[in-house]
Amino acid sequence: MVVLAASITTRQGKPLLSRQFKDLSKDRVLELLSNFQNLVSEISSDHTFVEDKHVRYVYRPFDNYYIILITNRQSNIIKDLATLNLFSQTINSYLSSFQDQEIFHNAFEILSSFDEIVSMGGYKENLSFTQVQTYLSMESHEERIQEIIERNKEIEATEERKRRAKEIARKEHERKHGFMSSNGDYDGANRFMGSKDPNVTNAINSYYSHASPAAQQSYLQSSHAAAAEVAPVASPMATSQRAGHSATGGMKLGGGAGRRAGAAPRPSAISSASSGTPPPPEEDVPENNGILISIKEVINAEFSRDGTIHSSELKGVLELRINDHDLSHSNLKLADSIDVRDKSFQFKTHPNIDKQSFLSTKLISLRDKSKAFPANDQSLGVLRWRKVAPAEDDSLIPLTLTTWVSPSESQQGFDVIIEYESVLETELADVIFTIPVFPQEPVDINTESSTCSDAEVVNMDQEMGTSIKISKIAANDAGALAFTIEAPYEDALYPMTVSFQESTRDKLAKSFTGMAIQSVVMANDHDQELPYDVITSLKSDEYLVQ
């Protein structure tokens, strides 16, 4: 067989795409396609080929279009039909709907598939549909492995830079403040630390309760250090008694001296290292009244210190949870607020979901109409999406950030102001700013410059750094968080990490990107609507200020 050309035309005879495999001019191809239109209008729709004096047209109609192979009259018609079937499969894999614009948009991929199926001499390659897809994807296993290796190297290098920065900051603190053992008060307390005489203990507590704040902090650290040294050889009862006595002494000392408003006490290095960051609480399982739809989105973003957006990425998932078998034969209709044909989104349906129905009618339904969704009250992800915005594009930014840093006049450190602005229609909860430093002095939250009155230090340790929490940021609210923190140099304050979350339970709620549910209907009767609930949520994953 020899294929002269492969073309796509409308039923009215308008040529859309054509690929010539022999030396045919454009005018000659247009003339042949015009002749085909005249021939096909004179025969019934049951035929699959027509001929004139010079060539044979093997064709297949689909919607308002024709796929046409122009061959010589001596070509094997059986092989021509097999080739036409392969062309049809390949074209269908690229088109979500049969429209002129969709065909033009995927013209490069369609023509490339033509070249894979038929060589330039007009002879069909011995390929299957799967092989054509593999060749067109142009994936390389070795290239993927190399990309993974390079990505892992970048991650390791980033972690190593952070670790070295923390180590430099720690050494700088030690160099500035010296070791605690050089402090005279520490040595004096250490001589009597092993004494069990209650008179000696009371005398030491009484002395340090009226001492300076620096001396009090030194004494507390020495107490923790002594307890840590004795702990391995002490009995459990004795350990608990010493812990209780130490806590009592700490309360007495803490009552003798005041702190500035908003200042948070600094826990000792030993207590912080042993306790670590408390594990996050387990999420409550929301109540399900029959059909519960969860729309979850996670945002990653990176800002410069002046607020410029370097990158942003959003990932989302739509989960379906059913606990009633009578409601399992259902379909989900998406609202008009989301455009499933938006090329800036990457949508991916579950393998059991009818993708054609999703793209054409925004309907989430099973491919096998005889089956139903599981009614085991377990969440099932049926749709995922991803969107990446270019630099300086704020379309995926729910919370903008700008930082201002200046040397502090009151102590060795920096005055930091973090300006923020929320663009959400709902409030953000549990907004936590984490600075990767572990200061020796307490963090002072400036209540005069801060617009958030509930800001507080919630964690300080050598591994995570210092975390300051704002319980909530109102919808479309802008404000500032101001504080003074000790750091060896300005770059040690970065990268700052911000975490937040937002959740709404409302049937009419829509996600940050506009994903929402219009209705839930029976699979066999779209006029019968079913009751359902919707929960939308937005969380940050890696939200950084570099």
From Swiss-Prot:
Domain of life: Eukaryota
Record's bilayer topology term: Peripheral membrane protein
GO CC annotation: COPI vesicle coat; Golgi membrane
Signal peptide: none
Positions of the MHD domain: 288-546
Cellular localisation: Cytoplasm; Golgi apparatus membrane; Cytoplasmic vesicle, COPI-coated vesicle membrane
Disordered: annotated span: 236-287
Region (Interaction with DSL1): 190-440
Pfam families named in the record: Adap_comp_sub, Clat_adaptor_s
Keywords: Cytoplasm, Cytoplasmic vesicle, ER-Golgi transport, Golgi apparatus, Membrane, Phosphoprotein, Protein transport, Transport
UniProt xrefs under Gene3D superfamilies: 3.30.450.60, Mu homology domain, subdomain B
Composition bias, Low complexity: 260-276
In-chain residues carrying the UniProt-annotated modification Phosphothreonine: 277
GO annotation terms (biological process): endoplasmic reticulum to Golgi vesicle-mediated transport; Golgi distribution to daughter cells; Golgi inheritance; Golgi localization; protein transport; retrograde vesicle-mediated transport, Golgi to endoplasmic reticulum
Function noted in UniProt: The coatomer is a cytosolic protein complex that binds to dilysine motifs and reversibly associates with Golgi non-clathrin-coated vesicles, which further mediate biosynthetic protein transport from the ER, via the Golgi up to the trans Golgi network. Coatomer complex is required for budding from Golgi membranes, and is essential for the retrograde Golgi-to-ER transport of dilysine-tagged proteins.
Similarity comment text for this entry: Belongs to the adaptor complexes medium subunit family. Delta-COP subfamily.
Miscellaneous information on this protein: Present with 18000 molecules/cell in log phase SD medium.
Complex formation: Oligomeric complex that consists of at least the alpha, beta, beta', gamma, delta, epsilon and zeta subunits. Interacts with DSL1.
Protein name stated in the entry: Coatomer subunit delta
